[in-house]
Amino acid sequence: MICRNDSGYILRPSLPEDSQNYARLFDQVDPEVARLTGSALHYDCDEVVSFFLANIDDETRRDFLLLDPTSRIIGESVIKEIDSRLRSANFRIAIFDTSSLGCGIGSWAIEQTVDFAFREIGLHRLSLDVYSFNPRAIRAYEKAGFVREGVLRDAVIDSANGNYGNDILMSILESEWREHR
């Protein structure tokens, strides 16, 4: 899958030659991005490269990179834990470039990835979890047709204030995706 939107953003599969540029994203993670995704603020470059390259060959995942119009990596969209027998998988997305937040880029990437999951992989169910203190992501997932199906209460800590937050479980079924399109 290679998709380009009207603004020139591209969503495409991760390639081995992307590993170093991808690793640079994790040299110093924006505190707000780390807060909303549960990430650390810093990762070892070699470990990120190894992880990235291993994921490319992993048959239970499909990793996509989100590039801005200058071809700079600004995020990723991942279908993981693909279970071919159950036709189910887990989904996650992260926009690392905070200047790209709130512009609809994430919603577009979610839509493209969800379409790929059902159309190309042939999934029956795609699930995700999102922190209760990430309302922008919750709205984007609901806009894409995901339905809330459960809550893990006080399962995470909001690094902004030290308070507990909920981990919201969401999913979309193939029939819901077809109706939503």
Question: PLM ranges: what are they?
Answer:
Residues 41-99, 173-175:
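Acetyl-CoA-dependent GNAT
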Residues 127-130, 147-163:
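Conserved catalytic-core motifs of GNAT/GCN5-like acyltransferases
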Residues 107, 132-150:
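Conserved active-site alpha-helix within GNAT-family acetyltransferase domains
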Residues 119-129:
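Conserved GNAT acetyl-CoA-binding A-motif
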Residues 61, 165-169:
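Short hydrophobic/aromatic beta-strand or adjacent loop that forms the aromatic wall/cage
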Residues 1-49, 175-181:
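A short, well-structured alpha-helix characteristic of acyl/acetyltransferase catalytic modules
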Residues 100, 104-113:
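Conserved acetyl-CoA pyrophosphate-binding loop and the N-cap/start of the following alpha-helix
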Residues 97-99, 103, 132-133:
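Active-site acidic-Proline motif in GNAT/NAT acetyltransferases
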